[in-house]
Amino acid sequence: MQRIRKGDKVVVITGKNKGGSGIVLKVLTKQNKAIVEGINKVTVHKKEQVNKRSKQTNPTTKEAPLPLNKLALFDQKAKQQTIGKIKYQIDPKTKQKTRVFKKTNNAI
């Protein structure tokens, strides 16, 4: 089960981007990686398709995937990171499960 989902606020806990935070844009479950907004940017050079002989390239930057074990969920109310441990609470009005942090009982 993946604890980190699309739209979650996460913090990088190891590596060159340690301490950086952002929102998860996409989770790649088969590769066990996630793409985080503004973290792990790489430059990609793409050729223009104007004609076959043109050799112009446009450098653009985009986010590269990060392994999930380098990320931790961030509790915005408590202003601290939590590694894993999520429990579910059933909302009595809507009868739906909501994810909450086990340590602080704040909703994710």
Swiss-Prot record:
It comes from the Bacteria. The gene is rplX. One of its GO terms (molecular function) is structural constituent of ribosome. Belongs to the universal ribosomal protein uL24 family. GO terms for cellular component: cytosolic large ribosomal subunit. HAMAP family: Ribosomal_uL24_B. The keyword Cytoplasm does not apply. This is Large ribosomal subunit protein uL24. Part of the 50S ribosomal subunit. One of its GO terms (biological process) is translation. NCBIfam families: rplX_bact. PANTHER family: MITOCHONDRIAL RIBOSOMAL PROTEIN L24. Keywords: Ribonucleoprotein, Ribosomal protein, RNA-binding, rRNA-binding. It comes from Mycoplasma genitalium (strain ATCC 33530 / DSM 19775 / NCTC 10195 / G37) (Mycoplasmoides genitalium). One of two assembly initiator proteins, it binds directly to the 5'-end of the 23S rRNA, where it nucleates assembly of the 50S subunit. One of the proteins that surrounds the polypeptide exit tunnel on the outside of the subunit.
